[in-house]
Amino acid sequence: MDQEMVTKETEKYIELPLLASRGVVVFPHMVIPLLVGREKSIEALEKAMVKDKEIIILSQKDEKIEDPDPEDLYTIGTIAEVKQLVKLPNGMLKVVVEGIKRARIIDFIEIDEYFEVRAEILDQTVPEVDLEMKALMKAVLNKFQEYIKYNRNLPSETIMTVTNIEEPARFSDTIASHLELKFRQEQDLLEAISIKERLNKLLEIIKDEIEILKVEQKIQKKVRKQVEKTQKEYYLREQLKAIKEELDEDEEDDEIEEYRNKAEELDLPEKIREKVDKEIEKLKKTPSMSPEATVIRNYLDCVLDLPWNKVREEKIDLDEAKNVLDSEHYGLEDVKERILEYLAVRKLAPQKKSPILCLIGAPGVGKTSLGRSIARALGRDFVRLSLGGVRDEAEIRGHRRTYIGSRPGRIINAMREAGSKNPVFLLDEVDKMSSDFRGDPAAALLEVLDPEQNNEFTDHYLELPFDLSKVLFVTTANVAYPIPAPLLDRMEVIELPGYTEDEKVEIALRHLIPRILNEHGLTEDEIHFSSNSIYRIIREYTREAGVRNLERKLAAITRKVSKEIVEGRGRQARVTTQSIEKYLGVPKFKYEKAQKKDRVGVATGMAYTQTGGDILDIEVAVVPGKGKLTLTGSLGDVMKESARAALSYIRSKQEELGLSDNFHEEYDLHVHVPKGATPKDGPSAGITIASAIASALTGQPVKGKYAMTGEVTLRGRVLPVGGIKTKIMAARRAGLKDIIMPEENKKDFEEIPVKIKKDIRVNFVNHMDQVLDLILGGDEDEN
């Protein structure tokens, strides 16, 4: 280098033309070719060539900027010497530069068409190589050697070049220039002025790069191995194919032969057989390892597993069927009678289409287990499908085979599982289905449950008609109103009311306790439940229409007795009403007990609930005011309207009741239904509210021995209501034996067990006047 260059290098500051680079960092001692096309950069290079061929290279912060300003450039760059410059035909320059030293920009000087910068030279002093520096250099060198092993793009001679460098600054910059780094990492290394800081950064970067290269190499090895395996299989398969052709062999492999034999054995309908043969031929021509072959196999397995012609032979014996139903279910006489009727018709007319039964009742009343009993009574297979939470139509109809991961719908899968064409098919929780953007499963069920259509039910996956007409469908639901009307119309609804206390006790003694004792390894000699103890469990530890919680409580007692026996604290236990609390703790529930007192403004109604029903006091207070009606007690809209209708009726009877003409302008009425935290709704408290209002306004007490239910109209007509059995059981449990109910509910009363009828006296009414005569005074007309 000439004397002028030496002089300039000894100076602390320097002024040189600026070359802005995009996405490239030039390190000291690094030789790199650059392609230059921007006018300012070309001017700067030409200026440098006129002088001493030196230039300062700064990287742009954003390489997308075409004409960068000083704030768009990093402040630390590299002083470089232009080694070679070639003008290209398109006007661009190809230059080769060698980095010399780092420099920090102090000021920018704009001259004509390019920038000159005033910069401070940073690599002026050579640091002392102490033990820490040597250790760092050795660590970096070792990691760089490991890096070269994984990065095949670098020649092995590179390591020899680096090993011979003793100067720390040049050592670090040379290694940095050979690494495949991100632009930001390169700039960080360039800006690391301290040699030790630079070496530490370099060490961490190389470690990270080695880990990345290891993962990449592992993935490449795995992919290469898989490709080699696939190529090998393809090559061998083609060889095998060629050998068979040379030997003139047309031998089907075992898999194809197996599918053909199975199709022959099943004696499929002609349309189905054509489809199966077509799929078998397609499988034969498809490479066995291809995804398409797997799809065809799954399809053939599904089609050939279905019971196209397999029908379970029925042995219809009404006496045997009755014994089966009675042995597994206590009560439920209406349901049993309907099943026996179906069996009788089935015996006389075997070709008659099966009905669709819909069992509606509270949880735990035996809907699902009744489905199993029906299958056993008929001697058929049983299959259950829960529809709770289903919201995709494809769950019923299946997915088309064009989709990845397609599969048949749950109806076809269940028939495949049943193994026969005429099972008892229980569709559980049909009221829990919902719909979304994927379709409405309830709409898809319309075809399944329609006897006129289900003989050709087509699943999207099968694309073949399947006959469901011989299936006896039984559906279950807790309530009917969520079920769409078209679907409900296709079913014969049978309501399962809640069990009476007597029925629950019988179920416990006949079914629950023997099963629980067997499950817990106990005998009747080791534990005995008295009937009264079961009554107490039902009344004070459960609140339900069914018997699930009763079974849990009985099981809890049995577990505690088992523990006592194992610990040697007893050999047998007798569970009585007094010992219940020892096993189950304090009572959890308390049913409302009737006060039976004659009270002004208080009438007792009967409420229907999913847990067995209860009695409900309606309270009315009359206070001075302007005729305002206040309703409290968490009442629904229907119940509020019922209260307003009751008040209007009482106002229309003001003369008969002896009320003043303007009482409705002088007094406010407050109607309250206790247990305010419990939501209440429905019209069945109409006559109870009207009775309480009449009592409060006239000052005559309501006879406390009566419980009542019925809807009232503005004209005073008493309309029928639902849940009669449950309501009567609630009144009886509360100690009330005198009931007032609508005349039109006589038919419901006839269905109540005789044992309960004997304990109560029912007054059937069709007008509110009759109710007021009964509860407010006069001769009682007891039926």
UniProtKB/Swiss-Prot annotation:
Catalytic EC class: hydrolase
Top-level taxon: Bacteria
Annotated GO CC locations: cytoplasm
List of residues binding ATP: G361, A362, P363, G364, V365, G366, K367, T368
CDD domains: RecA-like_Lon
Residues annotated as the enzyme's active site: S684, K727
Disulfide bonds: none
The EC number(s) this enzyme carries: 3.4.21.53
One biological process term in Gene Ontology: protein quality control for misfolded or incompletely synthesized proteins
Domain spans labelled Lon N-terminal: 16-210
Induction, as annotated: By heat shock.
GO molecular function, one term: serine-type endopeptidase activity
Domain Lon proteolytic residues, every copy: 597-778
Entry's family note: Belongs to the peptidase S16 family.
Quaternary state and interactors: Homohexamer. Organized in a ring with a central cavity.
Role: ATP-dependent serine protease that mediates the selective degradation of mutant and abnormal proteins as well as certain short-lived regulatory proteins. Required for cellular homeostasis and for survival from DNA damage and developmental changes induced by stress. Degrades polypeptides processively to yield small peptide fragments that are 5 to 10 amino acids long. Binds to DNA in a double-stranded, site-specific manner.
NCBIfam families noted in UniProt: lon, PRK10787.1
Protein name: Lon protease
Species: Halothermothrix orenii (strain H 168 / OCM 544 / DSM 9562)
Classification lineage: Bacteria, Bacillati, Bacillota, Clostridia, Halanaerobiales
Chain's gene name: lon
